[in-house]
């Protein structure tokens, strides 16, 4: 399958990010786009996502949902064009080694009084 664009959500759940991908933002995605959520479930408005999926306009792969475990009767299970994994996306053989290396690097920068990597500033 060829996707016109891929949106990957990798961010923490905060007051600002809750329902960040609501019906309005989902509607801004290109036809044929793929939404991948490996962040936190409540970042995506699940009802709006189900509507978009069932329209066939976009597809999605979600490793997280706004209710975990997702109830067996939840409409997301029956939505078109969705892959649901059981919150295991970050569990790889390389994860711990890379995470330790990143944390060590950030702590060294902090101790040296240097700017940290990967800092997100509100409003930018």
Task: Give residue ranges: language-model regions.
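Rossmann-like adenosine-cofactor binding region
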Residues: 3-75
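C-terminal helix-to-coil terminal segments
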Residues: 68-124
